[in-house]
C-alpha cells in the first residue's frame, strides 16, 4: 500500500512455536532445536521509502535502543553490499506484536525488510541466501523469510514446509520480559531431547516446549498466566516466553476464552495463517 508521502506498507506477521525441543548444544555456543513454527495474523506493519543517497534511517527505534542495534536497521545495512546502485531506505515500524513475548516481532520486521529490499535494490539473492543472511540477525528470521508454516531444525535455519490444521489462538502476555539469554544458559534447561524421525503435526503430539519449565521457575508471572489459560484447554508457552497460548478449532470458541482472560491479562485473538502475506504481494 502506498502512502501519500511515498512510503509503502508491508506486513510482518507474528509466529507461534506449537512445539519446541532442544536437541543439543553446538560448539559455537548456540543450541540445535526442532520446532513447529506457525504464522498468525497478528502483525506489525513495516513502512519503507527508498532513498538514493545510501542512507538508512529508522524513524521510530525502540525507546533506549540506538537505531544501529535494531534488527530492521541491521537487515537493511546487511543488504547494502549486494545492491546494484547506491541504495538507501527510510524505515517506520507500526508495532502491534508485543516485544519480549516469544512471538518473533523484531525478527519478522527484519525479514520483511530483507524481502522487500532484495527486490527494490535488485540484490538478486535467492531465498536460501536470504535465509543464511537472516540467520546472522536472529534465529527466527529464517522462518519468516521461508514464509510458510514449517518444521525447523538446526538453529532454526533448516526448514521444511509443514501442513498445520486451521486453528484460532488465544495468546496471553504476562507483565514480564523474559531474558532469552538467561534461559538458554540456565543449568536446568533440557538440552538432550531426541530428534524426530518422522516429524508431522500429528506425530509430534503431545506438544511441549523444553524451555517452559525453566521459565516458569524463574518467572512466576508466566506460570500464573499459563495456569489461568490452562483452565480453558491445553496451553503452551511460545519461544522463550513470555507469551502463552491455547488453540481452538473455531473463532467463537477462541473469542469466548479471549473475553475471559482479557479481563486479567494483555491478550490477543489470532487466526493461523498458511503462508506469509508477502507471498501474496
UniProtKB/Swiss-Prot annotation:
UniProt cross-references to Pfam families, sorted A to Z: GHMP_kinases_C (PF08544), GHMP_kinases_N (PF00288)
InterPro entries to which the protein is assigned, alphabetical: GHMP_kinase_C_dom, GHMP_kinase_C_sf, GHMP_kinase_N_dom, IspE, Ribosomal_Su5_D2-typ_SF, Ribsml_uS5_D2-typ_fold_subgr
Keywords: ATP-binding, Isoprene biosynthesis, Kinase, Nucleotide-binding, Transferase
Gene3D superfamilies for this protein: 3.30.230.10, GHMP kinase, C-terminal domain (3.30.70.890)
Active site positions: 15, 140
A GO term for molecular function: 4-(cytidine 5'-diphospho)-2-C-methyl-D-erythritol kinase activity
Reaction equations catalysed: 4-CDP-2-C-methyl-D-erythritol + ATP = 4-CDP-2-C-methyl-D-erythritol 2-phosphate + ADP + H(+)
Residues at which ATP binds: 98-108
Nucleotide-binding in keyword set: yes
GO biological process, one term: isopentenyl diphosphate biosynthetic process, methylerythritol 4-phosphate pathway
Domain of life according to the entry: Bacteria
UniProt enzyme class: transferase
Metabolic or biological pathway, per its Swiss-Prot or TrEMBL entry: Isoprenoid biosynthesis; isopentenyl diphosphate biosynthesis via DXP pathway; isopentenyl diphosphate from 1-deoxy-D-xylulose 5-phosphate: step 3/6
EC code: 2.7.1.148
Cysteine pairs bridged by disulfides in the record: none
HAMAP family per UniProt: IspE (MF_00061)
Family: Belongs to the GHMP kinase family. IspE subfamily.
Its job: Catalyzes the phosphorylation of the position 2 hydroxy group of 4-diphosphocytidyl-2C-methyl-D-erythritol.
Protein name according to UniProt: 4-diphosphocytidyl-2-C-methyl-D-erythritol kinase
Source species of the chain: Neisseria meningitidis serogroup C / serotype 2a (strain ATCC 700532 / DSM 15464 / FAM18)
Gene this chain is encoded by: ispE
